């Protein structure tokens, strides 16, 4: 459904996590995993093309150019709408991550990662968050809601961090908004 709704950009939320699976899940049978990912991508492409090709034929040359280039790759290099600099998302992060950024326990646990290291769950979240954020920052067209699919990854990351150091102290687990 994602490819039909938003085009191939939805793959940015899936492929980095899939490609980085050996990092977040050591011991994973890589050939089987990669084969499954390839099969899923090809299946999704077949479903999307089953709609896009007849639509392009019916809509004519200009419509075909817009759905296959203008609405996808054309937005990456030279957006016709919402063109913003690569750093545009950075000043918005404090607002997007409020009130989590005010949570002292989260910061303590983040600092503790230097000595404890990253487990598979944290690596999974980072494999989802960081590449997608970096790629969306490089794409010329930017809208704040493009980052909404990253919120679950951040929530999982924050939850895993906090659960790793849980002492059931009200100061650690109480939200800043409370």
Locate each region found by the language model:
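Transmembrane-lumen/periplasm boundary regions of multi-pass, lipid-linked membrane glycan transferases
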Residues: 10-144, 153-164, 173-178
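Short conserved active-site loop signatures built around small residues
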Residues: 149
């Amino acid at each position: 459904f994602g490819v039909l709704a938003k085009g191939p950009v939805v793959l940015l939320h899936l492929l980095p996590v899939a490609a980085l699976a050996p990092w977040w899940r050591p011991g994973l049978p890589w050939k089987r995993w990669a084969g499954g990912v390839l099969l899923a991508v090809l299946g999704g492409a077949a479903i999307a093309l089953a709609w896009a090709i007849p639509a392009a034929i019916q809509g004519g040359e200009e419509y075909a150019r817009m759905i296959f280039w203008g609405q996808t790759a054309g937005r990456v290099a030279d957006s016709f709408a919402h063109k913003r600099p690569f750093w545009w998302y950075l000043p918005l992060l404090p607002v997007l991550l409020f009130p989590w950024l005010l949570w002292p326990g989260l910061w303590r646990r983040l600092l503790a990662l230097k000595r404890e290291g990253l487990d598979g769950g944290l690596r999974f979240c980072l494999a989802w968050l960081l590449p997608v954020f970096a790629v969306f920052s490089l794409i010329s067209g930017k809208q704040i809601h493009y980052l909404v699919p990253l919120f679950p990854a951040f929530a999982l990351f924050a939850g895993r961090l906090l659960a790793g150091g849980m002492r059931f102290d009200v100061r650690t687990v109480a939200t800043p908004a409370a």
